[in-house]
Amino acid sequence: MTRPPAPAPKPQRGRPRDPERSRRLLEAAQRHFNEHGLERANVDAIAADAGVSKTTVYNNFGSKEGLFQAVVGDRSAKVVAGVTSAVALDPNQPEKALLAIGARFLALTRGDDALGALRSVYGVAGAQPDVCREFYRQGPERVKGELAAYLRSAHSARTLKVRNPLQAADLFLSMFLGSGHIRGLLKLEMADSREDRALLREAVRVFMEAYGA
């Protein structure tokens, strides 16, 4: 008796196997989500912009919301990649380490990837809690955790006196999220490099004054 043919395997969801096609699709989706937001963005227009079929989008991401989550995840990865591990810095030179960490974080908060990701996530706050939670876990929480780990090592080396490393890390990073960052989110004129350097030096001075051993 002839056996019936085996059913075709179901397509696996995730990024398309072709890296170039994946890049085009995520970049096109990012542009459309930036311009129109999640609710008004159109999958047909995204697919046409990326040069793929609408079927490809749904086969790989399941829905427009799934594609949006992939875009946010891609941006989060790029953002975190811009901040090298703080743990690798010398705990015996906290001022130098904080200047390096602060400079990278300041550049990150002014960058298009981070600002675009924040705008996109703010636009779905409440409606897409899983997307927001994952963005926070992969982005802000991870950066804060790495800085806290460095502060623990500096505390152990007795070059800083930090009783609550997570709180101290939060306070340090928050000093870079003032009016300059808000202007960036609102697409207004950004602070120039001289203002940013002055902010960096003052943030490190204030932190060392509070936590220096």
Label the model's feature ranges.
Residues 70, 83-116, 161, 165-172:
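Hydrophobic alpha-helical connector segments
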Residues 133, 155-205:
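Hydrophobic/aromatic-rich alpha-helical bundle segments in the mid-to-C-terminal region
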Residues 73-79:
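Short, basic, alpha-helical segments at the C-terminal edge of helix-turn-helix-like DNA-binding modules
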Residues 103-110, 118-126, 207-210:
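Helix-loop "lid/cap" segments that line or gate small-molecule binding pockets
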Residues 96, 107-108, 116, 120, ...:
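Amphipathic alpha-helical packing segments from all-alpha helical-bundle domains
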Residues 35-39, 128, 157-158:
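Short coil/turn segments at alpha/beta junctions that flank glycine-rich nucleotide-binding fingerprints
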Residues 63, 111, 127-129:
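Short loop-to-helix capping motifs
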